[in-house]
Curated annotation (Swiss-Prot):
Zn(2+) binds at C158, C161, C171, C174. ATP binds at K351. A motif ('KMSKS' region) lies at residues 348-352. The lineage of its organism: Bacteria, Pseudomonadati, Pseudomonadota, Betaproteobacteria, Burkholderiales. This is Methionine--tRNA ligase. GO terms for biological process: methionyl-tRNA aminoacylation. Its EC number is 6.1.1.10. Belongs to the class-I aminoacyl-tRNA synthetase family. MetG type 1 subfamily. Keywords: Aminoacyl-tRNA synthetase, ATP-binding, Cytoplasm, Ligase, Metal-binding, Nucleotide-binding, Protein biosynthesis, RNA-binding, tRNA-binding, Zinc. It comes from Burkholderia pseudomallei (strain 1710b). Homodimer.
C-alpha cells in the first residue's frame, strides 16, 4: 500500500496547512470510563497527534453527554440533583482521559448555554424549512411515577421465545425486535407497576422527506469505509422504496434536558442535542481562544470535520446528524470513522471474570497507560473490525516490542556515549545507511497513521527496531569498549544507535506521547514533528543522563487488575453447603453475592464478606447442576417461607424439593418453568418431608435494602436433565 493509496484527505480539501475539527463520541454521564470506551479515545487521539505533528490547525473536541431519563433517575437514586451528578461524573471522566493522554483541546458538557442555543437554532431552522412534524402518539406510561417510559425502561416476557425480563425494544435471548406493546406482562423498571397506554403530542424530524433521501444518497458516496457505505445503502434501500422513517426528537416531562421552544413540557430527545454538543464544545473553545466559530461550521466552510465513533451509533451519525446539518444551513461532516467493539480474552467484558476493566482501576493498579495505548494501536486499522485484548499477548507484546526492542536501544548506547564521548554524537555517523533507511520510512509510517492503519505503522516501526538491534548486536559495542583503539568505531555505533532511537521515537510519538516527551528531554531536542526526520542529532548538543523510560509488565499487575474488577462471587459449593446446613432446599448465586434463599441475615452477611475459601475445579466438578422442570408446586402448610416443588430432572421419577422462595412467587407462577438444581445434594429429612436437592435462586447481598428472590431460568432450548457446567 503506497502513500498515494492512503486516502484520508478528501477530494477538494485544502492542501498545505489544513484546518480540521475532530470529535470522539460523547461518553454518557452516568457511569465510569472503561477500557472499551478507551479504544475510541485512544484511536482518535493518535490520529489527532499525527496531524498536529504535520503542523495542521486541528482541534480535538469532546464533552460529556448529560441529558436523558437515565441521568435523571440515577441522580434521584443517589439523592443529588442531575446537575450535581453530571458535574461529578465530568471530573471523573476528565481525570481518566488525562491519565491516558487523551489530548482534548476542549472537554465540555452538553448541559451548557452554548448547546441550548445551538440546539434551538438548528431545530427552528429545520422547522422553518418544513422538516418538523407534530403528531399524537401513544406511549407506555408509569401510573405510579407519572412519567412516560422509554422502551429500555419497560421489561416483560418476550412475545416470541417467552424469555423473562426482556427490554421493551428487543429480546437479548432470541434477538427479536418489537414494540413495547408486544411484551407479555410488561412492567416499569422504575416502579415495577404495569404501564398503561397514554397519548401525547410529539415532534418529529421528517427524515422521510424526499429531500433527505436525495441528500443522503449523495452524501453516503463520500464515506471512507465500505462497511459504513454498505450499511447506509441498506438503510436507505433502493430509490423509491422510502425506507427512512421520521425520527421522534421529543420527550415528555419529567425529563432532564432542554425544553423545546414553543412547546412547554416537551424536551429535546438526548440524541438531538448530543451531536450538537460537538459544536457547542467547539464554540466554547472558540470564544476562549478568539477563533471564528462561524467560519468552521457554515455551509461553504473549507475546513474539515471528522467524527470517530463506535459502529453501534453509525445510524445517528450518518443519517440524522448530516441531514440535520444540511437542512439547517450548516456544513456536513467530511467523514465519519467507525471502529468495532472490544473483547477481552476473546469474550465480552465481564464483571464476574474481572475483565470489565475501568480506566481508574487500570491506573490504580499501577499499569502504564501507554502500554494500553500501544496494544490498542497495534490492533487497530481503518475497518470496523472488533479487536480483542488478550491479556497474555498484551504482556508479551509490550515486554517484547516496547522494552526489549525499542527502549533497550537507548539503554545500550547512552552509557558509553556519556562516559567516553561527553554525551556527544559523532557527526559522520549521521550519514550511516541504516539511518537513511529509517528516515526514508518515516513518511510512509506517518501516512499509515493518517489512514488509521495503526497496526501497519507499528509493524513497520518494529521491523525497523529489529534492524537497529541487529546492527547493535553485530557491532558489539560492549566488546569495542574493552579496547581504546576501537574508540572511533564505538563512537559511531553509539551515535548511530541513538539517532536510530530518535527516529523510532518519532515514529512512535503519536502512540507514546509521554515516552516521546521523555526522549526529547533525554536527547535535549525540541518536540518532534514529522519534518524532523531529516534533522539528525547534533554534536553541539550533548545528551543527558539516561532515565528509564519504561518498565516491563509484571504478571502480578495483571492478576491485581482482574481481582480489582472481579465481582464478589461465592462458590456454588459453599452456597449448597450453607443451604443444606440451614435445612433449606433453595440456594442463590449472583454477582452481588450468593446465599441460601432462606438463611438468617447473619449467615447472609458471612456468605458475602468475601471470606469464602477458594475451591479448585475438582471441587466444583463434584457439584451436579441439572436443568429441572417444575411440574407441580404448592405452598407448605405451617411455613411462611417454603414452597414444595415437584421437579422433572430427566430421571424415571420426579424429585421433591422444599425451597424458601414463597415470599417471591405464587405456586401457579412456577409451574411449567425450567430452573437449575443441585442434583447430588444429600437428601435431607425436614419437618415437612424429604428434600431431594436444591434449586438455585439469586438475591442481593443486603435483602433489607434490596429485597427480592429470583430463581434461575435457562435460555430456551434447555431440557430437563441437561447438565449445567
Amino acid at each position: 500500500m503506497s502513500a498515494s493509496d492512503l486516502t484520508s484527505v478528501q477530494a477538494g480539501a485544502p492542501q498545505g496547512r489544513r484546518q480540521i475539527l475532530v470529535t470522539s463520541a460523547l461518553p454518557y454521564a452516568n457511569g465510569q470510563i472503561h477500557i472499551g470506551h478507551l479504544v475510541e479515545y485512544i484511536q482518535t487521539d493518535i490520529w489527532v497527534r499525527t496531524m498536529r505533528m504535520h503542523g495542521h490547525e486541528i482541534y480535538y473536541i469532546g464533552a460529556d453527554d448529560t441529558h436523558g431519563t437515565p441521568v435523571m433517575l440515577r441522580a434521584e437514586q443517589e439523592g443529588v440533583s442531575p446537575k450535581q451528578l453530571i458535574e461529578r461524573v465530568w471530573r471523573e471522566h476528565k481525570r481518566d482521559f488525562d491519565s491516558f493522554g487523551v489530548s482534548f483541546d476542549n472537554f465540555y458538557t452538553t448541559d451548557s448555554d452554548e448547546n441550548r442555543v445551538l440546539s434551538e437554532t438548528i431545530y427552528l431552522a429545520l422547522k422553518e424549512a418544513g422538516f418538523i412534524a407534530e403528531r399524537e402518539i401513544e406511549q407506555a406510561y408509569d401510573p405510579v411515577r407519572q412519567m412516560f417510559l422509554p422502551d429500555r425502561f419497560i421489561k416483560g416476557e418476550c412475545p416470541k421465545c417467552h424469555a423473562k425480563d426482556q427490554y421493551g425494544d428487543s429480546c437479548e435471548v432470541c434477538g427479536t425486535t418489537y414494540q413495547p406493546t408486544d411484551l407479555i406482562h410488561p412492567y416499569s423498571v422504575v416502579s415495577g407497576a404495569a404501564p398503561v397506554r397514554k397519548t401525547s403530542t410529539h415532534y418529529f424530524f421528517r427524515l422521510s422527506d424526499p429531500r433527505c433521501e436525495a441528500f443522503l444518497r449523495e452524501w453516503v458516496s463520500g464515506l471512507a469505509q465500505p462497511e459504513a457505505t454498505n450499511k447506509m445503502r441498506e438503510w436507505l434501500g433502493e430509490a423509491g422504496e422510502a425506507k427512512l422513517a421520521d425520527w421522534d426528537i421529543s420527550r415528555d416531562a419529567p425529563y432532564f434536558g432542554f425544553e423545546i421552544p414553543g412547546a412547554p413540557g416537551k424536551y429535546f430527545y438526548v440524541w438531538l442535542d448530543a451531536p450538537v454538543g460537538y459544536y457547542a464544545s467547539f464554540k466554547n473553545l472558540c470564544e476562549r481562544r478568539g477563533l471564528d466559530f462561524d467560519a468552521w461550521i457554515r455551509k461553504d466552510s473549507t475546513t474539515e470535520q471528522y467524527h470517530f465513533i463506535g459502529k453501534d451509533i453509525l445510524y445517528f451519525h450518518t443519517l440524522f446528524w448530516p441531514a440535520m446539518l444540511e437542512f439547517s444551513g450548516h456544513r456536513t461532516p467530511t467523514n465519519v470513522f467507525a471502529h468495532g467493539f472490544l473483547t477481552v480474552d476473546g469474550a465480552k467484558m465481564s464483571k464476574s471474570r474481572g475483565t470489565f476493566i475501568t480506566a481508574q482501576s487500570y491506573i490504580d493498579t499501577g499499569l502504564n497507560p501507554e502500554w494500553l495505548r500501544y496494544y490498542f494501536a497495534a490492533k487497530l486499522n481503518a475497518t470496523m473490525e472488533d479487536i480483542d485484548l488478550n491479556l497474555e499477548d498484551f504482556q508479551a507484546r509490550v515486554n517484547s516490542d516496547l522494552v526489549g526492542k525499542y527502549v533497550n536501544i537507548a539503554s545500550r548506547a547512552a552509557g558509553f556515549l556519556l562516559k567516553r564521548f561527553d554525551g556527544r554524537v559523532q557527526a559522520s555517523a549521521m550519514n550511516h545507511p541504516l539511518l537513511a533507511t529509517l528516515r526514508g520510512a518515516i513518511p510512509q509510517i506517518a501516512a499509515h497513521y493518517e489512514a488509521r492503519e495503526y497496526g501497519r505503522a507499528l509493524r513497520q516501526t518494529m521491523e525497523l527496531a529489529d534492524a537497529v538491534n541487529g546492527y547493535v548486536d553485530s557491532a558489539k559495542p560492549w566488546e569495542l569498549a574493552k579496547d581504546p583503539a576501537n574508540a572511533v568505531a564505538l563512537h559511531e555505533t553509539c551515535s548511530v544507535s541513538l539517532e536510530a532511537f530518535r527516529l523510532l521515537s518519532l515514529a512512535l510519538k503519536p502512540v507514546l506521547p509521554r515516552v516521546a516527551q521523555g526522549v526529547e528531554a533525554f536527547l535535549g531536542i525540541a518536540p518532534l514533528t514529522w519534518a524532523d526526520a531529516g534533522t539528525p542529532l547534533s554534536p553541539e548538543q550533548p545528551v543527558r543522563a539516561y532515565q528509564h523510560l519504561m518498565t516491563r509488565v509484571d504478571p502480578k499487575q495483571i492478576d491485581a487488575l482482574l481481582a480489582a474488577n472481579r465481582g464478589s462471587l461465592q462458590g456454588t459449593a459453599a452456597a449448597a453447603e450453607a443451604g443444606a446446613a440451614n435445612g433449606n432446599g433453595a440456594g442463590s448465586k449472583n454477582g452481588k453475592g450468593a446465599k441460601a434463599a432462606a438463611q438468617p441475615a447473619a449467615s447472609a452477611a458471612n456468605a458475602d464478606d468475601g471470606a469464602s475459601p477458594i475451591i479448585s475445579i475438582d471441587d466444583f466438578a463434584k457439584i451436579d447442576l441439572r436443568i429441572a422442570k417444575i411440574v407441580a408446586c404448592q405452598a407448605v402448610e405451617g411455613s411462611d417461607k417454603l414452597l414444595q416443588l415437584t421437579l422433572d430432572v430427566g430421571e424415571e421419577r420426579t424429585r421433591n424439593v422444599f425451597s424458601g422462595i414463597k415470599s417471591a412467587y405464587r405456586p401457579e407462577q412456577l409451574v411449567g418453568k425450567l430452573t437449575v438444581m443441585v442434583a447430588n445434594l444429600a437428601p435431607r429429612k425436614m419437618k415437612f418431608g424429604l428434600s431431594e436437592g436444591m434449586v438455585l435462586a439469586a438475591s442481593a447481598a443486603d435483602e433489607k435494602a434490596e429485597p427480592g428472590l429470583y430463581i434461575l431460568e435457562p435460555h430456551s432450548g434447555a431440557k430437563p436433565g441437561m447438565r449445567v457446567k
